[in-house]
From Swiss-Prot:
GO cellular component terms, A-Z: mitochondrial large ribosomal subunit; mitochondrion
Keyword list, A-Z: Mitochondrion, Ribonucleoprotein, Ribosomal protein, Transit peptide
Gene: Mrpl17
Family membership: Belongs to the bacterial ribosomal protein bL17 family.
Organism ancestry: Eukaryota, Metazoa, Chordata, Craniata, Vertebrata
Protein name (database record): Large ribosomal subunit protein bL17m
Amino acid sequence: MRLSLAAAISHGRVYRRLGLGPESRIHLLRNLLTGLVRHERIEATWARVDEMRGYAEKLIDYGKLGDTNERAMRMADFWLTEKDLIPKLFKVLAPRFQGQNGNYTRMLQIPNRKEQDRAKMAVIEYKGNCLPPLPLPHRDSNLTLLNQLLLGLQQDLHHNQKASLHSSHTVQTPKT
């Protein structure tokens, strides 16, 4: 039997395809970025959020350059489809992250869509926003496979110790 690694080979593609083509992908990313700047928290599929995250971080880096920087203004003008959000980028979001280098966003997985296609969903938000905090997922470590195996081992050892104590206390009398 021969194994194929065709799924792992990207053939020069370094990004997700997300839509009907390159132009559709850019429009989708622009709309998602505009929504993120406007609301500071959005919900989308995991693939879209993961792809958009780098662009959201880079947009803040350009915003930190200031509104007098020509390249920063061009990037903001291109990526934000609603032009009333450009001042928010430079006057609200960029000063919030002025002393920070990178890691401006938080991405959390949320339950999959139920009624449609069961797509893996996520929430992305800018850190330090005024929205109520999202509940961080709590993983119950007692339910991991390793911990379940250790628990079973402990129970077996405890049971064996009880059995050995019980057998040592019962004295067998010789039969005559």
